[in-house]
Swiss-Prot record:
Belongs to the UPF0301 (AlgH) family. Gene3D superfamilies: VC0467-like. This is UPF0301 protein AZC_0488. It comes from Azorhizobium caulinodans (strain ATCC 43989 / DSM 5975 / JCM 20966 / LMG 6465 / NBRC 14845 / NCIMB 13405 / ORS 571). InterPro entries: AlgH-like. One of its GO terms (cellular component) is cytosol.
């Protein structure tokens, strides 16, 4: 589903949305995406795949996950490099919630494992990137998502036309920003939209 290609902004509403951010509208009927901000990693005629970037996984942090996956022994949990301690664990979406996906800056690349998306953002789903982060050799910026959001062919386009989503250009602050809870309103402000102005009648940007 994930095509190895990069599309640059700006895009028209009929174009594929790789590298764009989806902002859930009040008309979104799926409660799992209430106030969700989704980074689109791949979008084609075959469907779409994205990562929710503003829903923290409250049951586990990055260090504990590294121990669970045997990336580091429990005795090394408190000795992680400072950058590793900053990596947030997110609920990336309702599909394959037991699988991890790392969105990260483009200063780190694994051959045959890293997918460049757009504007210096990459996706890697490999234990090797977790080992690199734990060893202080990982990317400058990263978040780890458990699961992803997926759409069947034409499904995302239909949801956008039904005013389920706004879409806007993504930037590192929306993906890697420290305040996860503030990302949704920040994305709206980047579009010039006040959260209180949203209604079920709004269209896509």
């Amino acid at each position: 589903m994930m095509a190895d290609r990069t599309i640059s902004s700006p895009r028209g509403p009929g174009d594929f949305l790789d590298g764009q951010m989806l902002i859930a509208m009040p008309s979104m009927r799926d409660e799992r995406f209430n106030r969700a901000l989704v980074y689109i990693c791949a979008h084609s005629a075959e469907g779409a795949m994205g990562i929710v970037v503003n829903q923290p996984a409250t049951h586990i942090d990055f260090g504990d996950l590294l121990v669970q996956l045997d990336v580091v022994p429990a005795t090394k949990r408190i000795q992680l490099p400072p950058r590793a301690e900053l990596v947030k664990v997110l609920r990336g979406g309702p599909v394959e919630t037991g699988r991890g996906f790392v969105l990260h800056s483009s200063d780190f690349f694994l051959e045959n494992a890293t997918l460049p998306i757009d504007n210096g953002i990459c996706l890697t789903a490999s234990l090797d990137i977790l080992k690199a982060i734990a060893g202080g050799q990982g990317p400058e910026s990263a978040v780890l998502a458990l699961g992803y959001a997926g759409w069947a062919p034409g499904q995302l386009e239909t949801e956008i036309q039904a005013n389920g989503w706004l879409h806007c250009p993504a930037d590192p602050e929306l993906i890697f920003g420290e305040s996860v809870d503030a990302k949704y309103d920040l994305a709206l402000r980047k579009l010039g939209v006040h959260p209180g102005m949203l209604s079920t009648d709004a269209g896509h940007a």
